[in-house]
Amino acid sequence: MILKILIMIPDGIFWNNKAEEIILPTNTGQIGILKNHAPLITALDIGVILIRTDKKWVPFIIMGGFALIKQNKITILVNGAESAGTLKLVQSEAAFQEATNKLENAKSKKQYVDALFLFKCAKARYQAAKQLVS
């Protein structure tokens, strides 16, 4: 293990461990971080963080935030985080389909913004559930 990763939520520390690699969902797409990455601060979108420990990928769902990468230490501050360990693929897929329908049928700006948030959350949970199955 070569990266020190700290995920913080408003209530405190969510995850604190070492890893070999991490993939973050930034506002401009995914970014992979390996040992000796250049220093970086980036905004994070709602999505799935993938952390590789001992040749195994561990997914976490995050609700947006920021990441600081410096000297093999990654500090992640997020609005919320969930472990993907209890997700079920069938329920996650159904919730994703329902959120997609709400987004497509939104009539007002407020409905669209609310539906977009639900869509991003449902999509992240569905992606994390698929990661657990593979």
From Swiss-Prot:
Cellular compartment(s): Plastid membrane
GO terms assigned for molecular function: proton-transporting ATP synthase activity, rotational mechanism
Membrane-topology annotation of the record: Peripheral membrane protein
Record field: transmembrane: none
Matches recorded under Pfam families: ATP-synt_DE_N
Superkingdom to which the source organism belongs: Eukaryota
Swiss-Prot/TrEMBL keywords: ATP synthesis, CF(1), Hydrogen ion transport, Ion transport, Membrane, Plastid, Transport
Quaternary state and interactors: F-type ATPases have 2 components, CF(1) - the catalytic core - and CF(0) - the membrane proton channel. CF(1) has five subunits: alpha(3), beta(3), gamma(1), delta(1), epsilon(1). CF(0) has three main subunits: a, b and c.
Task of the protein: Produces ATP from ADP in the presence of a proton gradient across the membrane.
Family: Belongs to the ATPase epsilon chain family.
HAMAP family: ATP_synth_epsil_bac (MF_00530)
Name of the protein: ATP synthase epsilon chain, plastid
Gene that this polypeptide is encoded by: atpE
